[in-house]
Each structure stands twice: as C-alpha cells, then as structure tokens.
Amino acid sequence: GDIIDVDNDLFEHEQDGVAGTSVHGEYEAYDAYGNEYEVKYIADHLGFRVL
C-alpha cells in the first residue's frame, strides 16, 4: 500500500510496498531552470537501488 505520497509544484514522491520489507517508488523534482529529474528506486533485502 501507499507509504509516501507527496505532490507539490516542485517535488513529487510516491512510495508503495510494505515498510521494513520491500518498497519501490519514484520521485520527481525540478531545478531552478525548470528541468525535470525523475528517479525510480527499490529498497529490499538487497539494499537500496536506483532503477
């Protein structure tokens, strides 16, 4: 289920899974020039990994 769900004009972060077991998510942010950056990740028994 949803663990994190944040959304505003400059930043968005969504995370799903089971806290303490396995989660996956993504976040998006904008720099001062309006460029968008997106990162998808997973965190589980193997550690935190960017996809």
UniProtKB/Swiss-Prot annotation:
Expressing tissues: Calcified shell.
Entry keyword Glycoprotein: no
Keyword vocabulary terms for this entry: Cuticle
Pfam families named in the record: Chitin_bind_4
Residues covered by the Chitin-binding type R&R domain: 1-51
PROSITE patterns the UniProt entry points to: CHIT_BIND_RR_2 (PS51155)
The keyword Ligase is assigned to this record: no
The organism's place on the tree of life at top rank: Eukaryota
Listed GO MF terms: structural constituent of cuticle
Protein name: Cuticle protein CP575
Provenance organism: Cancer pagurus (Rock crab)
